C-alpha cells in the first residue's frame, strides 16, 4: 500500500507518497525534503518527530520509551506508514 505522509517542518508543510515498506525519512529524502537524522538505525533521537494524525509502525526503533511513544513521538528513520499520516518534524529537543 502507498500512503500520503505530510511533514510539518519549520519551513512549512510538505507531502510525499510513501509505500508501507519504506521508512518515512527515506521517502522524504527521495522527495528532496531535508530532515534531521544521525544514526539511521532507530537508536538515537536526531530524527525524532511527533505524529499529529494517522499511524506508523516503528517496531524497528529501540530508543523511545513507552511513554514517549504514547505521546506520539516517532523516529522517522525507523517508521513505516500504516495509514495516511501527518508528522511534525524537528522534535528532538522535546524528548528530554
From Swiss-Prot:
GO CC entries: chloroplast
Subcellular location: Plastid, Chloroplast
Coiled coil: none
Gene Ontology biological process terms, A to Z: electron transport chain
Keywords: 2Fe-2S, Chloroplast, Electron transport, Iron, Iron-sulfur, Metal-binding, Plastid, Transport
Residues the entry annotates as binding [2Fe-2S] cluster: 39, 44, 47, 77
Major subcellular location class: plastid
Domain 2Fe-2S ferredoxin-type: from-to ranges: 3-93
UniProt cofactor(s): [2Fe-2S] cluster
Keyword Iron-sulfur: yes
Manner of cofactor binding, per the entry note: Binds 1 [2Fe-2S] cluster.
Role, per record: Ferredoxins are iron-sulfur proteins that transfer electrons in a wide variety of metabolic reactions.
Family from the record: Belongs to the 2Fe2S plant-type ferredoxin family.
Protein name listed in UniProt: Ferredoxin
Naturally occurring in which organism (per UniProt): Brassica napus
Amino acid at each position: 500500500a502507498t500512503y500520503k505522509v505530510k511533514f510539518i517542518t519549520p519551513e512549512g508543510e510538505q507531502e510525499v507518497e510513501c509505500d508501507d515498506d519504506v521508512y518515512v525519512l527515506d521517502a522524504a529524502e527521495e522527495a528532496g525534503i531535508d530532515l534531521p537524522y544521525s544514526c539511521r538505525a532507530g537508536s538515537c533521537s536526531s530524527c525524532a518527530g511527533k505524529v499529529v494524525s494517522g499511524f506508523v509502525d516503528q517496531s524497528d526503533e529501540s530508543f523511545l520509551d513507552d511513554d514517549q511513544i504514547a505521546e506520539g513521538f516517532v523516529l522517522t528513520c525507523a517508521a513505516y506508514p500504516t495509514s495516511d499520516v501527518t508528522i511534525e518534524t524537528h522534535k528532538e529537543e522535546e524528548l528530554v
